[in-house]
Amino acid sequence: MFQSFDTVSDPSLAAGRVARLRARLAQAGVDGFLVPRADEHQGEYVPACAERLAWITGFTGSAGVALIMQDKAWLFVDGRYTLQGRAQTDPGLFEIVDLVETPPAAFMRTRLPAGARVGFDPWLHTIDEARKLRKALGEGGGALLALDENPLDAVWQDRPAPPLKPVAIHPERYAGRLARDKLAELAATIADTDASHAV
Protein backbone atom coordinates (compact mmCIF):
# COMPACT_ATOMS: atom_id res chain seq x y z
CA MET A 1 0.00 0.00 0.00
CA PHE A 2 1.43 3.39 -0.98
CA GLN A 3 0.37 6.91 -0.10
CA SER A 4 -1.65 8.58 -2.82
CA PHE A 5 -1.19 12.23 -3.60
CA ASP A 6 -4.24 12.24 -5.85
CA THR A 7 -6.79 11.88 -3.06
CA VAL A 8 -9.66 14.31 -3.37
CA SER A 9 -11.61 15.34 -0.30
CA ASP A 10 -14.91 17.14 0.08
CA PRO A 11 -15.10 19.27 3.24
CA SER A 12 -18.82 19.84 2.66
CA LEU A 13 -19.51 16.24 3.75
CA ALA A 14 -18.05 16.82 7.22
CA ALA A 15 -20.99 18.70 8.76
CA GLY A 16 -23.44 15.81 8.47
CA ARG A 17 -20.84 13.29 9.56
CA VAL A 18 -19.82 15.32 12.60
CA ALA A 19 -23.49 15.79 13.55
CA ARG A 20 -24.08 12.02 13.42
CA LEU A 21 -20.94 11.40 15.47
CA ARG A 22 -21.99 13.97 18.08
CA ALA A 23 -25.38 12.30 18.43
CA ARG A 24 -23.63 8.97 18.97
CA LEU A 25 -21.30 10.53 21.56
CA ALA A 26 -24.30 11.87 23.47
CA GLN A 27 -25.78 8.37 23.50
CA ALA A 28 -22.47 7.01 24.82
CA GLY A 29 -22.38 9.61 27.61
CA VAL A 30 -19.15 11.32 26.52
CA ASP A 31 -18.50 14.96 25.70
CA GLY A 32 -16.00 14.35 22.93
CA PHE A 33 -13.98 11.85 20.94
CA LEU A 34 -10.43 11.60 19.62
CA VAL A 35 -9.93 10.53 16.01
CA PRO A 36 -6.29 9.77 15.12
CA ARG A 37 -4.93 8.92 11.72
CA ALA A 38 -4.01 5.46 12.85
CA ASP A 39 -5.16 1.90 12.63
CA GLU A 40 -4.85 -1.01 15.03
CA HIS A 41 -1.27 -1.64 13.89
CA GLN A 42 0.05 1.93 14.32
CA GLY A 43 1.58 1.82 10.84
CA GLU A 44 2.27 4.76 8.58
CA TYR A 45 0.00 3.45 5.84
CA VAL A 46 -3.58 2.64 6.77
CA PRO A 47 -6.18 0.80 4.68
CA ALA A 48 -9.25 2.66 3.41
CA CYS A 49 -11.38 1.19 6.21
CA ALA A 50 -9.11 2.92 8.75
CA GLU A 51 -9.10 6.38 7.13
CA ARG A 52 -11.32 7.67 9.93
CA LEU A 53 -9.64 11.07 10.16
CA ALA A 54 -10.10 11.71 6.43
CA TRP A 55 -13.71 10.54 6.55
CA ILE A 56 -14.76 12.78 9.44
CA THR A 57 -12.70 15.89 8.59
CA GLY A 58 -11.86 15.73 4.87
CA PHE A 59 -8.14 15.99 5.72
CA THR A 60 -6.09 13.40 3.81
CA GLY A 61 -2.58 14.02 5.16
CA SER A 62 -0.55 11.17 6.63
CA ALA A 63 -0.44 12.49 10.21
CA GLY A 64 -2.95 14.21 12.45
CA VAL A 65 -5.65 13.81 15.05
CA ALA A 66 -9.07 15.40 15.51
CA LEU A 67 -10.76 16.22 18.80
CA ILE A 68 -14.49 16.51 18.33
CA MET A 69 -16.53 17.89 21.21
CA GLN A 70 -20.27 18.61 21.23
CA ASP A 71 -19.82 22.30 20.41
CA LYS A 72 -16.34 22.58 18.85
CA ALA A 73 -13.81 20.53 16.91
CA TRP A 74 -10.09 20.80 16.26
CA LEU A 75 -7.69 19.20 13.81
CA PHE A 76 -4.12 18.83 15.10
CA VAL A 77 -1.49 18.70 12.35
CA ASP A 78 2.22 19.41 12.14
CA GLY A 79 3.70 22.18 10.02
CA ARG A 80 3.77 20.03 6.88
CA TYR A 81 0.00 19.97 6.80
CA THR A 82 -1.15 23.39 8.00
CA LEU A 83 -2.15 24.62 4.53
CA GLN A 84 -3.57 21.25 3.48
CA GLY A 85 -5.58 21.05 6.70
CA ARG A 86 -7.09 24.48 6.06
CA ALA A 87 -7.84 23.66 2.42
CA GLN A 88 -9.45 20.28 3.09
CA THR A 89 -11.58 21.02 6.16
CA ASP A 90 -14.65 23.11 6.81
CA PRO A 91 -13.42 26.17 8.77
CA GLY A 92 -16.86 26.48 10.31
CA LEU A 93 -16.33 23.07 11.93
CA PHE A 94 -12.62 22.55 12.49
CA GLU A 95 -10.01 24.86 13.95
CA ILE A 96 -6.47 23.90 12.87
CA VAL A 97 -4.00 23.50 15.77
CA ASP A 98 -0.24 23.02 15.48
CA LEU A 99 0.41 19.51 16.77
CA VAL A 100 4.01 20.29 17.74
CA GLU A 101 3.42 23.60 19.53
CA THR A 102 0.24 22.39 21.24
CA PRO A 103 -0.06 18.59 21.45
CA PRO A 104 -3.55 17.26 22.20
CA ALA A 105 -2.72 16.54 25.87
CA ALA A 106 -1.51 20.11 26.47
CA PHE A 107 -4.50 21.49 24.57
CA MET A 108 -6.98 19.41 26.55
CA ARG A 109 -5.38 20.47 29.82
CA THR A 110 -5.91 24.16 29.09
CA ARG A 111 -8.81 24.43 26.64
CA LEU A 112 -11.43 21.88 27.65
CA PRO A 113 -13.97 22.62 30.36
CA ALA A 114 -13.41 21.14 33.81
CA GLY A 115 -14.86 17.66 34.07
CA ALA A 116 -14.77 16.96 30.32
CA ARG A 117 -15.28 13.29 29.45
CA VAL A 118 -13.44 12.38 26.25
CA GLY A 119 -13.84 8.99 24.64
CA PHE A 120 -11.22 7.17 22.61
CA ASP A 121 -10.80 3.88 20.78
CA PRO A 122 -8.03 2.10 22.73
CA TRP A 123 -7.06 0.10 19.63
CA LEU A 124 -6.01 3.30 17.84
CA HIS A 125 -3.76 4.92 20.46
CA THR A 126 -0.49 3.88 22.04
CA ILE A 127 -0.30 3.28 25.78
CA ASP A 128 1.94 6.33 26.13
CA GLU A 129 -0.57 8.56 24.31
CA ALA A 130 -3.39 7.31 26.51
CA ARG A 131 -1.39 7.95 29.69
CA LYS A 132 -0.59 11.53 28.68
CA LEU A 133 -4.17 12.25 27.67
CA ARG A 134 -5.59 10.64 30.82
CA LYS A 135 -3.24 12.69 33.01
CA ALA A 136 -4.06 15.94 31.21
CA LEU A 137 -7.81 15.43 31.49
CA GLY A 138 -7.54 14.24 35.09
CA GLU A 139 -5.85 17.48 36.11
CA GLY A 140 -9.06 19.29 35.18
CA GLY A 141 -11.33 16.78 36.85
CA GLY A 142 -12.11 15.17 33.51
CA ALA A 143 -11.68 11.65 32.26
CA LEU A 144 -10.36 9.79 29.24
CA LEU A 145 -12.72 6.90 28.58
CA ALA A 146 -11.84 3.81 26.56
CA LEU A 147 -14.95 2.98 24.56
CA ASP A 148 -15.95 -0.59 23.74
CA GLU A 149 -17.24 0.48 20.34
CA ASN A 150 -15.75 3.15 18.08
CA PRO A 151 -18.66 5.60 17.65
CA LEU A 152 -17.24 6.89 14.37
CA ASP A 153 -17.30 3.39 12.90
CA ALA A 154 -20.93 3.11 13.98
CA VAL A 155 -21.96 6.16 11.93
CA TRP A 156 -19.69 5.51 8.90
CA GLN A 157 -22.35 3.80 6.79
CA ASP A 158 -20.32 3.21 3.63
CA ARG A 159 -17.09 2.22 5.36
CA PRO A 160 -14.93 0.01 3.12
CA ALA A 161 -14.32 -3.58 4.19
CA PRO A 162 -10.93 -4.42 5.70
CA PRO A 163 -8.41 -5.68 3.15
CA LEU A 164 -8.38 -9.42 2.71
CA LYS A 165 -5.33 -10.68 0.88
CA PRO A 166 -3.40 -13.96 1.04
CA VAL A 167 -0.53 -14.14 3.51
CA ALA A 168 2.84 -14.34 1.77
CA ILE A 169 5.79 -16.00 3.46
CA HIS A 170 9.05 -14.25 2.64
CA PRO A 171 11.89 -16.48 1.50
CA GLU A 172 14.69 -16.97 4.02
CA ARG A 173 16.97 -14.65 2.07
CA TYR A 174 14.59 -11.76 2.93
CA ALA A 175 13.46 -12.89 6.38
CA GLY A 176 16.89 -13.86 7.67
CA ARG A 177 15.62 -17.05 9.32
CA LEU A 178 13.01 -19.68 8.69
CA ALA A 179 9.61 -19.13 10.29
CA ARG A 180 9.81 -22.49 12.11
CA ASP A 181 13.11 -21.44 13.74
CA LYS A 182 11.63 -18.12 14.86
CA LEU A 183 8.57 -19.90 16.28
CA ALA A 184 10.74 -22.43 18.13
CA GLU A 185 12.72 -19.60 19.72
CA LEU A 186 9.51 -17.82 20.70
CA ALA A 187 8.11 -21.02 22.24
CA ALA A 188 11.32 -21.50 24.23
CA THR A 189 11.15 -17.91 25.52
CA ILE A 190 7.53 -18.37 26.57
CA ALA A 191 8.43 -21.56 28.44
CA ASP A 192 11.54 -20.01 30.06
CA THR A 193 9.57 -17.04 31.40
CA ASP A 194 6.61 -19.08 32.67
CA ALA A 195 4.33 -17.11 30.36
CA SER A 196 1.31 -18.70 28.77
CA HIS A 197 1.03 -16.51 25.67
CA ALA A 198 2.86 -13.99 23.50
CA VAL A 199 1.32 -11.16 21.55
Label the predicted regions.
Residues 1-199:
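Terminal domain-start leader segments
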